């Protein structure tokens, strides 16, 4: 047991680059966004947006052009396949694409995304870490076949590996693999350190080791600042984050570009429900050189507002579609805490299951 514990403790760092911690620990050892309740990254969004007001316009343009260029390069190779063509098979080996609609996969994916968000709250990860983990999961599912018969636990194992890899990419201190517990009640699973590490390597090889993707959270500071300067508003980073994750829970994050998701989230969080004409008018103030597909933004925006968990869909709007300032402030606060509230129940669910299954990755399950 002691040997296994020592091995488990070292596994979380086996895939990490050796970096100089002096470049990372700018907060005097506070642990960055790893510590606390996970809202430090939202504070950074507010601070960055405020600082952007005083920055040279050309620098902001250059930064956003860089993001768009990186995003375009990444999307062209990572999401050339539609999410509707995911490769899954049922217990009898029949292709799910030729069978009935994959409601079972939609349910499994939704449960996986919820678990990733709960885990983010439990460990205090920044929002970008959670979004990257979801993106890894969706990209993996485009390239690998998963048997339906093993989907519940195979999807959870994949989620653990994706969260672990995302944490190693983004967090100052990544948890040891032994710290990840994917249990839910008495039906939970406890994966060995070796099993998680194997899945990590499978994810890395499947994604061609391209892990540093652009996310909607990279755009939020600039978009929020621009929206505030040109058309008013632009705050509500918490509401924007909740909208982004609400959309990620409902459909693959590969369905829309990160810039599209960020623009839709900022507009929905700031203005609530708008007509198409009003939305396009607000979009014109985001950036003259920021090439946004209006059709795509409107589709993503509408999808966000249609989700029952969306904070913007619950808002009370005036006839012109604008929320009152008091309503906006209240909902922004609620949205900022909606995805952190599950952290209180997650540790209990992860530790109370007395009936655990210790699973190793069998051959032939993922191919």
Curated annotation (Swiss-Prot):
GO terms for cellular component: cyclin-dependent protein kinase holoenzyme complex; cytoplasm; nucleus. SUPFAM superfamilies: Cyclin-like (SSF47954). The keyword Transmembrane helix does not apply. SMART domains: CYCLIN. It comes from the Eukaryota. Residues 307-333 are annotated as: Disordered. One of its GO terms (molecular function) is cyclin-dependent protein serine/threonine kinase regulator activity. This is Cyclin-D5-1. It comes from Oryza sativa subsp. japonica. The gene is CYCD5-1.
């Amino acid at each position: 047991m002691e040997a296994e514990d020592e091995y488990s403790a070292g596994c979380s760092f086996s895939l990490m680059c050796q970096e100089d911690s002096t470049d990372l620990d700018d907060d005097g050892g506070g642990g960055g966004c790893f510590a606390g309740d996970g809202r430090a990254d939202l504070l950074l969004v507010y601070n960055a947006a405020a600082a952007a007001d005083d920055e040279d316009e050309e620098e902001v343009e250059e930064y956003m052009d860089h993001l768009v260029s990186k995003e375009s390069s990444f999307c062209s190779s990572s999401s050339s396949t539609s999410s509707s063509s995911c490769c899954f098979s049922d217990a009898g080996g029949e292709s799910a694409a030729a069978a009935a609609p994959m409601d079972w996969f939609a349910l499994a994916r939704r449960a996986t995304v919820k678990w990733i968000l709960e885990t983010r709250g439990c460990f205090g990860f920044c929002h970008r870490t959670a979004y990257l983990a979801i993106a890894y999961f969706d990209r993996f599912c485009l390239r690998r076949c998963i048997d339906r018969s093993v989907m519940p636990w195979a999807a959870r194992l994949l989620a653990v590996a994706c969260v672990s890899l995302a944490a190693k990419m983004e967090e100052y201190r990544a948890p040891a693999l032994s710290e990840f517990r994917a249990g839910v009640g008495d039906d939970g699973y406890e994966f060995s350190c070796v099993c998680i590490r194997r899945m990590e390597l499978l994810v890395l090889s499947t994604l061609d080791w391209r892990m540093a993707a652009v996310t909607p959270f990279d755009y939020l500071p600039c978009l929020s600042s621009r929206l505030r300067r040109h058309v008013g508003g632009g705050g509500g980073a918490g509401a924007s984050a909740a909208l982004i994750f609400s959309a990620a829970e409902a459909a693959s994050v590969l369905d829309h570009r990160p810039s599209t998701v960020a623009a839709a989230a900022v507009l929905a969080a700031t203005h609530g429900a708008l007509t198409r004409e009003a939305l396009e008018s607000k979009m014109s103030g985001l950036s003259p050189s920021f090439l946004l597909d209006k059709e795509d933004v409107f589709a993503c925006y509408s999808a966000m507002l249609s989700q029952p968990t969306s904070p913007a869909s619950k808002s009370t709007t005036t006839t012109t579609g604008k929320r009152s300032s008091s309503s906006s402030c209240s909902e922004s606060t609620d949205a900022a805490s909606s995805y952190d509230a599950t952290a209180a129940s997650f540790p209990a669910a992860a530790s109370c299951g007395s009936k655990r299954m210790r699973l190793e990755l069998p051959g032939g399950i993922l191919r």
